[in-house]
């Protein structure tokens, strides 16, 4: 097998380009067959949805790990380092592992159509998880579901976090069409857990689930969560499940939406625990007592979950928050959180809020800014180092038409972060948002120069 450096490996991968999106499963299936079908060597949870996929995946992976299992977690995109996409028990894989997996997949990629970036990285994830003998893999889709490269799995549970209008050029221009695409991950006789709220979309998912003889568990109907109180940088809530009530559950991930995300993860774990207990009753000898989901391990795994770049308090002086907020729903969630926590009307320690915003050119930037502008005192518009970044001057020009907030353009994320931090006043709060790419570049800058 050829050998290349880690840098050369990444250069080859990124040269495949983001716009090489091909929604079909034949290519990935062919590659995996040549690799010995690594995706069949572990149990899996498969997660689709518009927002919250990564948080839910992280909760489940943390809980399974705290329950004694060896767990792989595959998410995208990465914030700083490509290896973040492939984690095993909370640790990203090594550079050497990435190169080995890439070369193995590259050698198997000899079909009529060359694989895309996402197909190759997905095959790499399955190769790495099989090689490391993980017992569980928690797998996040890239886009959609039905024809997403991850949809070669036969999971134990599928999850659709929520739905909104996104990637319409690929997934369809109505919620019902998008629901049908994401519902394509539903497998025969495999439970679906979902937080989808729109009735028309729920009906689509119910129809697919019925055809596949798959039970469906819906947040708000079959299980729910009730927030009890906020703790320092976290939330406590009661989980009302399908057959259990767990009080004083705690997540350190911030925002009202994380209570629902937590509940979805807990519903998955409740189903897995029920299945585990049924197996124990059948044959007590086959169960490893050190590898068991319990209420205690679930509680611990939930409370320990971290998910970088999502309402992450990364610096205390000045207070700096990073949140990807890369689409309309995420921007709305962020604006609600900021309005509550950092508005000028706050009775305790009122603060001035500076936002650093950069948005990609395929996002509804006008609608996103309508949510974000009212909560800020000043906005610095910038752009990530990626071709799809929207010109920050375009963002500023629109901002000027809808409000009187003070604006500034600083083309480079590093310079924008440095300017905001060095010019921060007493009690200042800085929030960096609009794109996971902006979040990643800002996070790297802060960790390097300010911590």
Predicted segments, located by residue:
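Conserved catalytic-core segment of NTP-binding enzymes
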Residues: 145-147, 154-213, 365
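Nucleotide phosphate-binding/pyrophosphate-handling subdomain across enzymes
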Residues: 40, 131, 136-141, 148-159, ...
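ATP-dependent carboxylate-amine ligase catalytic core
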Residues: 25, 32-40, 66-153, 169-171
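Short Gly/Thr/Asp-enriched flexible loops that form oxyanion-binding sites at enzyme active sites
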Residues: 60, 146-156, 443-447
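Short functional linear segments
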Residues: 1-49, 56-67, 74, 110-112
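Active-site-proximal loop/hinge segments that shape catalytic or ion-binding/gating pockets
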Residues: 435
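Beta-strand->loop->alpha-helix junctions that form or flank phosphate-binding loops
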Residues: 195-196, 210-230, 251-256, 293-304, ...
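C-terminal helical cap/extension that packs against the catalytic core
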Residues: 198-207, 211-216, 319-321, 328, ...
């Amino acid at each position: 097998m050829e050998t290349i450096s880690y840098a050369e490996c990444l250069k080859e991968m990124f040269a495949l380009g983001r716009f090489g999106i091909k929604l079909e499963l034949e290519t990935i299936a062919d590659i995996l067959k040549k690799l010995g079908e690594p995706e069949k060597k572990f149990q899996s949870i498969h997660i689709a949805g518009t927002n919250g996929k990564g948080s839910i995946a992280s909760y489940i992976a943390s809980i399974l790990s705290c329950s004694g299992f060896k767990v792989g977690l595959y998410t995208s995109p990465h914030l700083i380092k490509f290896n973040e996409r492939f984690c095993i028990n909370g640790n990203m894989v090594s550079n050497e592992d990435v190169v080995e997996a890439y070369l193995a997949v590259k050698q198997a990629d000899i079909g009529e159509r060359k694989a895309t970036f996402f197909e190759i990285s997905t095959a790499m994830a399955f190769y790495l998880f099989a090689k490391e003998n993980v017992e569980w893999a928690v797998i996040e889709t890239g886009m959609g579901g039905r024809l997403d490269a991850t949809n070669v799995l036969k999971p134990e549970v599928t999850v659709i976090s929520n739905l909104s209008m996104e990637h319409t050029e690929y997934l369809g221009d109505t919620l019902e069409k998008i629901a049908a695409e994401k519902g394509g991950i539903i497998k025969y006789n495999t439970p679906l857990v979902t937080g989808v709220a729109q009735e028309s979309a729920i009906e689509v998912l119910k129809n697919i689930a019925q055809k596949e003889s798959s039970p469906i568990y819906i947040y708000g109907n079959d299980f729910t969560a009730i927030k009890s109180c906020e703790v320092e940088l976290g939330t406590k809530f009661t989980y009302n499940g399908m057959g259990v009530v767990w009080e004083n559950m705690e997540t350190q991930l911030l925002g009202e939406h994380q209570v629902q995300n937590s509940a979805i993860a807990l519903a998955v774990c409740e189903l897995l625990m029920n299945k585990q207990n049924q197996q124990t009753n059948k044959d007590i000898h086959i169960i490893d007592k050190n590898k068991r989901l319990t209420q205690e391990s679930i509680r611990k795994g939930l409370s320990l979950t971290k998910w970088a770049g999502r309402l992450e308090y990364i610096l205390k002086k000045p207070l700096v928050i990073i949140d990807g907020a890369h689409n309309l729903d995420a921007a709305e969630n962020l604006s609600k959180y900021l309005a509550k926590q950092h508005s000028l009307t706050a009775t305790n320690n009122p603060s001035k809020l500076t936002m650093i915003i950069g948005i990609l050119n395929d996002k509804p930037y006008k609608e996103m800014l309508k949510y974000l502008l009212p909560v800020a005192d000043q906005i610095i518009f910038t752009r990530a180092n990626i071709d799809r970044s929207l010109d920050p001057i375009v963002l500023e020009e629109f901002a000027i038409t809808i409000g009187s907030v003070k604006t500034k353009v600083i083309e480079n994320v590093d310079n924008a972060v440095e300017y905001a931090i060095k010019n921060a006043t007493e009690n200042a709060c800085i929030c960096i948002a609009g794109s996971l790419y902006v979040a990643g570049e800002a996070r790297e800058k802060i960790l390097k120069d300010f911590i």
